[in-house]
Amino acid sequence: MRIAVLSDIHANLPALEAVAADLPPVDEAWVLGDTVGYGPQPNEVIAALQAMGARSVMGNHDGAAIGTVDPVDFNPDARAAIQWTAGALDANARSYIAALPLVRADGEVTAVHGSPRDPIWEYITGPAIAAANLDAYETRLCLFGHTHLPVAFRALDGEIDATIGLPGTEARLGSERAMLNPGSVGQPRDGLRDAAYAVLELNGSSADDTFEFRRVVYDIDRTQRLMREAGLPARLTERLGYGR
C-alpha cells in the first residue's frame, strides 16, 4: 500500500495543487492537520481534499478557526490570520473541520497533528521528545506534523535515529517504532520554499517499508498575491518566499 502523507497545508491551494499533480500513484491520502490558517483559500483547499477522499485529522489552527481551540498561545500574526479564516469559512468547511478526529489509527499507522500524548499540540522537534512519545500510541508507525519540518525518528537498538527529510531522501523503516513527519505543504520552515510531502510505502514486510520525502515547486507568487488581497499579515506572506 502507498499512502500520500500531507500536513500543514494552511489554506495554500497552489501548493496543494502542485502536490496533487506531482503525486505518484497512491492508494490513500492522509492529511495530518492544519488544513487552514495562515493562507488565503481555506474553502477551496477543503473542497480539494474532499474531492481527493483524503483521510484527515484536526490541527490546532483548524480547531481555532471554528472556536474549539483557544488561540491564546498563537502569535499576533497567527491570531490575525485565524480571525480572518473564521470569517471566511463557508458552511461546508466548518462542517468538515468539526467532524475531524484528533487521532486516526488504521492497521500499523497512527496519525496525529502535534503529538500522540498530552499536550497534544506539543512540538516533536528532536530525538529526546520523540523517544518520550514512543509509548503514547499503539501502532508501529506514527505520522505527525505541526513543526513544518520533515524528519523521520526511528527506534534503533535502544537509540533514536533522526533522518532529516531532504528532498528525495528515503527512510527505511524496519520493524521498530518510528515517528514520521512529511514537512509542510503550505508553509515550509526548513529553509526550502517548495511544498513538502511524503509517500509511505507499506509492502507487507516491515523490512521493506519506506518513507520517501518529496518536494515540488508551486506558484508562490499566486499565493502571496491572494494573501495581500485578503489583507493577511505581511510577515506570513513574505515568509513563503524563503521557507522559514
Language model features: what each stretch is:
Residues 45-46, 51-138:
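Active-site neighborhood of divalent metal-dependent phosphoester bond hydrolases
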Residues 127-170, 175-180:
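Anionic-ligand binding region
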Residues 1-4, 105-111, 173-179, 209:
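Beta-strand-turn-beta hairpins that frame and shape the catalytic cleft
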Residues 1-54:
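N-terminal active-site segment of His-dependent metallophosphoesterases
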Residues 103-106, 150-154, 196-200:
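Short beta-strand scaffold segments in enzyme catalytic cores
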Residues 6-7, 29-34, 55-60, 112, ...:
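Active-site neighborhood of phospho(di)ester-bond hydrolases with catalytic His/Asp-centered motifs
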Residues 157-244:
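Acidic, His/Gly-rich catalytic cores of divalent-metal-dependent hydrolytic chemistry
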Residues 10-15, 37-40, 61-66, 117-119, ...:
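Active-site environment of divalent metal-dependent phosphoester hydrolases
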